[in-house]
């Protein structure tokens, strides 16, 4: 569907500004080369159609198909192999959002299931969320790219998360973004190419070397070296 006064939209100052959340629709073909994705924001990947295989850090070759949403935390590198023709709606966001005025990300820590071990949790795209995503995709394809549009859609999306998923589901899904380890992860991922020596890394993190090594193993599941 075409926009009225398209030139006014395209020349608007707000089309040039970066929003706190950015949505995009991407189409992949089966024969497309594997995609390597480095991100400095957390990203939600909603598969509207098709199937892909995702490798992200220690999580290898996880199939992700139509009707599912995956979370890639910021400062992670992912390798995506296209298995079938695939359409993705992605939402990259900063961690300064809430589900609603009465429920924030911080609240999710209280709903992590007992003995939970994170294993790249995938959630189903519920019916109302699917309807929202399809309308959103059409609007983006029509050319609505205003900063305010993206920010309003972000708020609506997280209200849908609040409404159509249990708190336990959300805690399991957003687990990588919860707790004190996120700042440590960000620090390591932002500096590992700049700092080569573990002692200097520990010093920059204001930790003793044994504490840094222990924290690294707890956070990344492997020893620092």
Model-derived segments and their meaning:
Residues 48, 162, 189, 193:
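Short, locally clustered residues in the helix-turn-helix/winged-helix DNA-binding domain
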Residues 105-133:
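Aromatic/histidine-rich interaction motifs
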Residues 125-138, 150-154, 171-205:
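A short, Lys/Arg-enriched amphipathic alpha-helix from helix-turn-helix/homeodomain DNA-binding modules
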Residues 17-113:
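N-terminal regulatory/effector-sensing and dimerization cores
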Residues 63, 147-151:
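Alpha-helix N-cap/helix-initiation sites
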Residues 160-167, 195-225:
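Basic/polar phosphate-binding segments, predominantly the helix-turn-helix DNA-binding elements
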Residues 1-19, 139-142:
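A short, N-terminal "cap"/entry segment at the start of jelly-roll beta-barrel domains
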């Amino acid at each position: 569907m075409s926009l009225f006064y398209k030139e006014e939209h395209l020349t608007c100052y707000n089309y040039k500004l970066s929003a706190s959340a950015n949505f995009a629709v991407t189409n992949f073909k089966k024969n497309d080369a594997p995609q390597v994705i480095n991100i400095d924001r957390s990203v939600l990947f909603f598969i509207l159609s098709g199937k892909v295989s995702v490798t992200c850090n220690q999580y290898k070759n996880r199939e992700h198909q139509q009707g599912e949403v995956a979370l890639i935390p910021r400062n992670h590198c992912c390798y995506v192999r296209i298995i079938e023709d695939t359409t993705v709606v992605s939402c990259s966001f900063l961690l300064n959002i809430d589900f609603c005025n009465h429920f924030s990300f911080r609240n999710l820590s209280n709903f992590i299931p007992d003995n939970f071990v994170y294993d790249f949790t995938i959630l189903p795209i519920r019916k109302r969320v699917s309807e929202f995503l399809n309308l959103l995709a059409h609007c983006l394809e029509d050319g609505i790219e205003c900063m305010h549009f993206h920010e309003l859609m972000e708020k609506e999306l997280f209200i849908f998360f609040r409404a159509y998923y249990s708190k336990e589901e959300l805690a399991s899904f957003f687990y990588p973004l919860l707790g004190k380890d996120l700042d440590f992860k960000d620090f390591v991922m932002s500096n590992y190419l700049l700092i080569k020596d573990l002692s200097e890394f520990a010093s920059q993190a204001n930790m003793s070397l044994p504490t840094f090594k222990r924290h690294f193993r707890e956070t990344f599941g492997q020893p620092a070296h």
